[in-house]
Amino acid sequence: MSTNNSVLVLKVGGALLQCEMGMARLMDTAAAMIADGQQVLMVHGGGCLVDEQLAANGMETVKLEGLRVTPPEQMPIIAGALAGTSNKILQGAATKAGIVSVGMSLADGNTVSAKIKDERLGLVGEVSPKDATYLKFILSQGWMPICSSIAMMDDGQMLNVNADQAATVLAKLVGGKLVLLSDVSGVLDGKGQLIPSLNGKQIAELVKQGVIEKGMKVKVEAALEVAQWMGQAVQVASWRDASQLVALAKGEAVGTQIQP
């Protein structure tokens, strides 16, 4: 049986949910890895679905420095889109690929501690690792947890957590290898070329130049945080080429490596 050190933590973005072929390829790859004894934990966002649901309810999407602002009146819709629809779409794709999965959120199993991140962002949470028991049990059965980024404070208040940050915390919790998957192949330079490797100093310089901004800035900073915490590189790669994941599981580099 695999140990915690072999857990592959895959964070997938909302764009994947709109690409049936991409989901199928990714889940087929995950199924093959699980059959080979690799433990896989999936963490997801769902920004596109959230935007659609808010618009359908006559509400506006507001972002501050790349992070979604979550007013209290939007929380039920955001929770439904992430912990409900997005989670079950991914679970359906996993089931179709023959994976036994457990749909969950950050609020389940006493997994994380949650608090308000910044009052300016409304009900946006910041989480820290708490108890790995629930996740370890699911993984030990050869099942794949599919975790949404909805958390809960001790008083029962739901919070919306950035999915990259959620994946970072869960990777810390299980001592796993983190891969941030999006619809781009990695971090691109000012000319649109892939940057194979970056460290903290280089990231700071590219942020200053405006090359890394908005959503990618959040993604890269989350990757840098976990790389420094765990003392190992974190990958930023594309789900469009799921075969990259097999290479990654073998220890080969794909996408952009964020160095500690």
Swiss-Prot record:
The keyword Amino-acid biosynthesis applies. It holds the Pfam family AA_kinase. It catalyses: N-acetyl-L-glutamate + ATP = N-acetyl-L-glutamyl 5-phosphate + ADP. This is Acetylglutamate kinase. Keywords: Amino-acid biosynthesis, Arginine biosynthesis, ATP-binding, Cytoplasm, Kinase, Nucleotide-binding, Transferase. It is found in: Cytoplasm. Belongs to the acetylglutamate kinase family. ArgB subfamily.
